[in-house]
Amino acid sequence: MEDRVEISMLMDFYSSLLTEKQRSVMALYYDDDLSLAEIAELNKTSRQAIHDLIKRCDKQLLSYESKLNLLQKSMRKEKYIMNFLEELKEKYSVSDKDYLMFKEKLENL
C-alpha cells in the first residue's frame, strides 16, 4: 500500500488518538495536500518542526495499527463481503437491486 494512502486510511481509524494539533497538521498535509511550508506558515512554526511532527504521527499511527489491526480487519471484512456478494450473485442470480441491498446490509454490520 502506498505510504500516503495508508496513512490517510490510518487517520480514519486512529486520528482521535492524536492531539488536536497533530490531527490538524495531519489533516492539512494528507487531506488538504498542503506543503510543509504552507502548514508551517499557518501554524507560525518552522517547516522542520512540521516535518518532525508529521513523521512522529506517522510512526504513532503505524504503531497503533500494529497493535490494534483495525485497518487490516476492516480491509479483510470488506474483501470477504465483496467475495460473498459476487458468489451470491453468480450462484443464485441475484438481481442488481437485491445485490445492492445485501451489500448495504452487510457493510452496516
Swiss-Prot record:
It holds the Pfam family UPF0122. Coiled coil: none annotated. InterPro entries: RNA_pol_sigma_r3/r4-like (IPR013324), UPF0122 (IPR007394), UPF0122_fam_protein (IPR054831), WH-like_DNA-bd_sf (IPR036388). It comes from the Bacteria. Might take part in the signal recognition particle (SRP) pathway. This is inferred from the conservation of its genetic proximity to ftsY/ffh. May be a regulatory protein. PANTHER family: UPF0122 PROTEIN CBO2450/CLC_2298 (PTHR40083), UPF0122 PROTEIN YLXM (PTHR40083:SF1). Belongs to the UPF0122 family. NCBIfam families: PRK00118.2-2 (NF001072), YlxM (NF045758). HAMAP family: UPF0122 (MF_00245). This is UPF0122 protein CLL_A1244.
